Structure formats: structure tokens, C-alpha cells
Amino acid sequence: MPSHSAAAFSATPSAARDGYVVAVRGAIVDVRFERDALPAVGDALVVTPDDLAPVLAEVQAHLSETMVRALALQTTAGLRRGTRVQAPGGPIETPVGEAVLGRLLDVTGATRDDGPALPAQIERRPIHRAAPPLASLKGTSTLFSTGIKVIDLLAPLAQGGKAAMFGGAGVGKTVLVMELIHAVVERYEGISVFAGVGERSREGHEMLLDMRTSGVLPRTVLVYGQMNEPPGARWRVPFTALTIAEYFRDERRQNVLLLMDNVFRFVQAGAEVSGLLGRMPSRVGYQPTLATEVASLQERIVSVGGVSVTAIEAVYVPADDFTDPAVTAIAAHLDSMVVLSRSMAAEGMYPAVDPIASSSILLDPLVVGEEHAAVATEVRRIIEHYRELQDVISLLGVEELGAEDRALVGRARRLQRFLTQPFAVTEAFTGEPGRSVALADTIAGCKAILAGECDTWQESSLYMIGTLDEGRQREAAAAQQSTAQQAAPAEKEPAA
């Protein structure tokens, strides 16, 4: 597909200033201009080789009165010294408006699907802008229902808030985000914007096909900067997606659901760019501007004037180290943290959400109500006490515990299994239809288990179900089967 990167800005031709390439070092391009034509830091540049598609770059530093250092957002293969460079006179811009709905865009706003080109006169907006002033922000106290039991109960999301799924490799972050897309986007009345940041092209293709199949694509914008693209594209693609979300919030007065997978790749791309620009690394090799870069993205995700942008993000945790500087920098901006546990994934407890480590600022009686807060607190207390007893159980066995502790262990194990549920996005692999559970049913089920109503049930009756009624049916079927087996006539002894 031809590149449309030269259309990633809307400056008039008369405003353009010409320079030429003096050095190319990977994704870094040094460009010389006339003394009075030096572009500003953050401005877009278009490198226009004679025999290749134009390459979009962004000014990162002034090296002298006539030279700038720019970061290319597309491959620099084939560029050479002396290549002409245009400075249109403004920052990188992305197309916004109704025309981008249902489309797949890249970091420059160019279409990357099989649809027609965007209208030539489409409105464009700079991808960099200041966060709204504090006085204009709206608080976040309305629950954002997901239909996922463990999240709605223990780490509820806020309408207009920021939530993230934290986890190492292979614990189910992307599956959880895709289930949220399936469960939430289909019944969401606003606009959805998905930013694929540094993830696999295969996953991006699958998501595009899934959205087409489910019929939600006409109300969704997909913006991809995939794993194979230069660090500049992965570093800037979240801002392109966020700019589109801000347009629908500010101009169309529509609530927006912003999904990002994976925010860690944004930080990782920033570290690559920092190294390419020759900056001194900080802790663990991250860029010295880590906190500033994360804040420049997260602080723009806000609700303004009664219209919300709700963000759900996936965050890769390198080596399962939750003290990693990138992870802690991202976590500082969130309202809800959903932590995925490798040990729970190993036990088959999907979604592998850690009920103790996950948290939300909304889990307060004044926000969620007394009943919800009390049930969530008791569920956490029992599961935490069960974990404290696991060493004793592994050494001596559960029979050595007191009667009260044995009952508590049984309820904790049943709670863990009740908080699992099959997902719609995994139905093709498991054969089990997905379940979406109302919060009231989740609370009622947990209350029944906490009260001991399920103490005699088989644990398997509560595994991978929706509501407690489904578990009750399983238990009744198991009891009926057991009775039938006991009542079956014994086999006749062979004749002597």
C-alpha cells in the first residue's frame, strides 16, 4: 500500500522550508536548513527521496543554528546524504472525525486497511497538546461494568477512569483486553478507540477480523504501531489514538472507550529513542525522562465537561518484576490495577487475576455501597488467610488444621473457583461459551459461599461458571449421577 505519510500535517505549501540530509544513523536523521528556516523542536519533517516513498520524521533537538536531529517514524532504508527534506511548519497531525470510524490507521493517520482513502479535506489535529486544566476535570465515581466477576467485585473500573491489566508474558493480558472489547464495546454507546502499541501483527489482524465479525467496527477506530515498526512509530502511536479520542470527547461530546495494548511497549520504544539520541540512561537502562513521558500520555486521559474518556490498558511486566521502574511509573496514574498472577494461571484459574494484589480506588462503601465493599473485603481476607496456611497444608496436610481453618480453606478454594469464568474470545479453543455476569449475581454468589451454603459442594461445580445458579445445577446433576451409580445393581458373580 502506498504511503500517505506526507499528509500527516496540514501546513500550506508556502509555509514549507527545504533542507537536506547530512547524516543517517538508524532511525536518527540529521538535517541542515538555512539559518532563518530552522524548524522548531516537535515539528514534522518530510524526507523526500527521488526513488522512494516519503519518510515522516519529527524534530527532537537543535544541534546548531542550522542543523536539527530528527526521529524517523518510518524506515530509513535507502535514504542517503543530500536527500531533500521539507519542513511544512507544524507538528505531526492525524485525521479526526466521522470518516476515521471503522478504519485502521497508522501513526501518521494513513489508512492501512483495504478501504478507500480518507477525504482530502478531512480535519486534522496535532498529536501533541497540553492536558486539560485541573479546574475542567470531572471526578470518577461511576462504576464501569465489565461482566467479569473478579474485576467487577475486587477491582471495579471507573467510568472516565484509567485501569490497567498488569502481568508477565503468557498470563493472559491480551486475552483479557480482547474479552473486555467483546463484552464492553458491543454494548457501549460511545466511541471506541484501540491503540495497538508494539504488539504482534498477528494479534492486530485477528482483532480487526473479530471486530468486523461482531459488528462493532463502525463505532471503533484502530490505530496500530506494530512490533516490526521503527521505535518512533511505537513511541508516537498512543498519542495519535489519544488525539482521535479527544476529538470525539471535545467536539462530538461523546463518551470514549480507549484501549491500549501494550503501554510498556510505549515506554520501551522511548528507551530505544533515548539511546539513539545519545541520552544518558537511568535505572535499568530506561530513559531519564521516563516519568515525564508516561505523564504526558496518561494525564491527557481525562473526563471533561461531563464527557468521559475511559482507558483500559495492558501493561507487560518484565520478568514478573512489579518494582520495575516502567511498571511503577505507569501504576502511579491509575484508578484500578488488575494484576495477573503466574501462579494462578498455572493452577488454571482463568482469568488469572490476583484477588489480593489487584485494587481500585472505587472499592469504598461511599462509592460501591456497604454490601459490595464488605463482601470484597471478606473475600480478600479469606483468600489471604488461605495463602498463609498453604505452607502448613503442604507439609502436614489439611487434616492437621483446626475445624475453623479447614472450613475457611474450603471456602477460599470455592471462592477462587467461583471467580473463574469462560470467555467468549476463547470459546473457539475451549468449546465453552463465554459468560457475562452482573455485579449483583457476583455479590450474591460470593455471599452464599462465605455463609457456608456451598461447603458440601464439589469444588468442580463452581469452576468456570457464570452465576451460582449454574453451579447449583452442576451440583444437583453430580448428586443425581452419584445416586444413580450407587443404585445400579451389582454385577452378578460368575457361576462356580
UniProtKB/Swiss-Prot annotation:
Q: Does the keyword DNA repair apply?
A: no
Q: What membrane topology does this protein have?
A: Peripheral membrane protein
Ordered alphabetically, the record's keywords are:
ATP synthesis, ATP-binding, Cell inner membrane, Cell membrane, CF(1), Hydrogen ion transport, Ion transport, Membrane, Nucleotide-binding, Translocase, Transport
Q: Which SMART domains match?
A: AAA
Q: Where does the chain bind ATP?
A: 167-174
Enzyme Commission number(s): 7.1.2.2
Write out the function statement from the record. Produces ATP from ADP in the presence of a proton gradient across the membrane. The catalytic sites are hosted primarily by the beta subunits.
Q: What protein am I looking at? A: ATP synthase subunit beta 1
> Which organism is this entry from?
Paraburkholderia xenovorans (strain LB400)
Which gene is transcribed and translated to give this protein?
atpD1
